[in-house]
Amino acid sequence: MAQKKGGGSTRNGRDSESKRLGVKVFGGQAINAGGIIIRQRGTRVHAGDNVGVGKDHTLFALVDGHVQFAVKGPAKKQHVSVVPAA
């Protein structure tokens, strides 16, 4: 008979890779057309002027300019816009 239990596999050791979500360019910072502003799950922040929405809800700039955040509407939803460079 074995004097020790078999060294079975542990039940730990699994974790998903982080998805690197969040704001990539903050208010007042310059951004080029096509640059990613926010990576998010769902529309936590909504697209404003000159901002496009990707199929994974990523917000990106449609023109060169500066990023501007605002809270709009009675529901106080956060919106992000790009103010074109003058």
UniProtKB/Swiss-Prot annotation:
Molecular-function GO terms, alphabetical: structural constituent of ribosome
Alphabetical keyword list: Ribonucleoprotein, Ribosomal protein
Family annotation (Pfam families): Ribosomal_L27 (PF01016)
Cited InterPro entries: Ribosomal_bL27, Ribosomal_bL27_CS
Coiled-coil stretches noted in the UniProt entry, renumbered to this chain: none
GO terms (BP aspect): translation
Protein name (Swiss-Prot/TrEMBL): Large ribosomal subunit protein bL27
Organism: Cupriavidus pinatubonensis (strain JMP 134 / LMG 1197) (Cupriavidus necator (strain JMP 134))
Gene this protein is translated from: rpmA
